[in-house]
Amino acid sequence: MNQPRTRGPIARLFIGLWDAVNFSRRLVFNLLFLLVVFVLLAAMLGGGKLAPLAERSTLVIAPEGRLVEQYSCDPVSRAFARATNGNDCREIRLRDVLRALDAARTDKRIERVVLHLDELQPSGFASLRDVATAIGRVKAAGKQVIAYGDNYSQGQYVLAAQANHVYLDPMSQGGVMLEGLAGYRQYFRQGLQDKLGIDMHLFKVGEYKSAAEPYILDAASAESKEADLFWMNDLWQRMLADIGRARGLDPAALAANIEAMDAQVAGANGDLAQLALKQKPVDGQKTREQVEDLLLEKGVADDTAEGGFRQVALDTYVQHLDGALPQADVRPQAAVAVAAGEIA
């Protein structure tokens, strides 16, 4: 009968080391898992009871993500994205922003509104226009609105233009990037027919039906260009009119400056911030610290708050508004279904 093989001391040493490494690996991964669970729970619970909203507070609106009618992610995914600073599920519900702005207009506890739009991602013009109109109502009610940022994209500036004062950070070398509207589409006829030998047969009714053009043409048809220019020009003129009205600028002069942007930038030696200051889309150049000093001077000091001035974030203010709502109406309600994306 064979005797069990006895391991030598060196083998037992390496086996022991491997067991220790394996145990450490499992311990570290389990601790990381527990940490993630703890962070998710903390993010979802939101820290418990809200502190009362103090008088003379500044409402800080710093959206991170794009404006949407309805969240596309579940609460757990949104909480995880916030906790890990991820790009997925970064969305701001449009009605929350509108509710906050409309409430701040008459809320005596809110002294002013600050817009920090650096993290606002491209959003639909209809949503941007709704928010811009709400900002205008706050300003019309006599409350100061201040916008500041490192750089303003076209969508971000649609909102910033409504502020009483618009500032650019001189350290960021950013500017106001108004560039108009454009549409891009890929065309596949050459690849399908000439290279793959696929013959496409398209039957359509109406000259302006262009959805299937990429399969039979190498470029947009005249009718497709005409249709796109029709809605793009209309949208662009509305955007210029809104910006011009808010900033006291002539929309035609604004459009002319954008058309000659290359020459304008060259004339400013590539300094986009100075160009924006010269053309009046912004009121001045201030660093983040200078803006915070300005808000501290006009507001109330708070050593526990970021920037040192008394403030309330958008999410927190919406929670205050939710807490003040009456009990749910038990009568039958009309549900609104939000549809987004392509119909396939």
At which residue positions do the language-model features occur?
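Short acidic-hydrophobic, aromatic-tinged amphipathic segments that line or gate anion-handling sites
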Residues: V166-L168, V282-R288
